[in-house]
Amino acid sequence: MNPSLIRKLEGLIERHEEVQAMLGEPDVAADQDRYRALTREYAQLEDIVHAFQQFRQAEENLDATRQMLEEDDADLREMAQEELPLAKATFEEQEQALQVMLLPRDPKDDNNCYLEIRAGAGGDEAAIFAGDLFRMYSRYAERQGWRVSIVSCNDGEHGGYKEVIAKVEGEHVYGRLKFESGGHRVQRVPETESQGRVHTSACTVAVLPEVPEAEQIEINPSELKIDTFRASGAGGQHVNKTDSAIRITHLPTGLVVECQDERSQHKNRAKAMSVLSARLQAAEDERHRAAEQSTRRNLVGSGDRSERIRTYNYPQGRLSEHRINLTLYRLGEIMEGDLDCVISPMIQEYQADQLASLAESN
């Protein structure tokens, strides 16, 4: 392993001991916010310390096996020859696992996020597919113990959504969903198709990390146009009584955000401002990425409709993830929320790219 990584690990072990001592101090225990923050840090460091111990054990085992190859005893040499492949494989596995844990973490990975799904080419069928995608993500969120709440939606004429924006809250939400941004294409026979022909439709998905209030981009109130209107859709008689829905237009960029989820105009405005802040921050982050002109693949999509990332082929029960050449014939399970079989390989590929970049820089 690279000496600089070993030094970094030794520093983390020292920090682990330091945090452990701090957690036993009365003044830390009295400060709940500080105590919770240190507890989280300790848990993360504990995993790294444990992984480092396993790495050292594998390293010692490999060294001992290699030394046995130099023994005079023929039986010992033969035994070492048999054990060497497993010892090397275990060492390499532990080394890679440890390196992955040391990769720079995106601080936004632990944030909640906004999930935006828009119907593209394909008319009614695209709107129906947008509804299917929203259901898929909702089922996945349920499996993860996350909470999903709709911020705004525009229903399709024959089901589904022309557009739906939802907030997803829970642990490590953005870190799991950030690879979903981009163009999603579906190939299937619509229910209204009498000839049995396969149609192709498309939707775009954008996943935006929620920006904590303290980090939000400062928005000049004079650059906002705020309209109120009556909410539509489910909600009983109340929806026709008050202009509780909010539409905010950010004049410099032309970004428009609507929210009609809450009965309170004040709450709708707060939600809309939060979505607007997330979109402005995402646009700023995209500008930074473009300025860096990175030669590495960017597996975290931008939500651009021209960036087709995935195809859902219903006649073949096939899902194709184009960014990593992954093909799975379990579309039914995936549409029911079993998304880890797609998301986990994406994360692994992303980490492999990061490791390659780290090796180049060292």
UniProtKB/Swiss-Prot annotation:
**What PROSITE patterns does UniProt report for this protein, alphabetically?**
RF_PROK_I
- N5-methylglutamine occurs at Q237
Q: Repeat as a keyword? A: no
Q: What modifications follow translation?
A: Methylated by PrmC. Methylation increases the termination efficiency of RF1.
- Domain of life from the UniProt record: Bacteria
- One Pfam family here: RF-1
- Report the subcellular localization: Cytoplasm
Under which name does UniProt file this protein? Peptide chain release factor 1
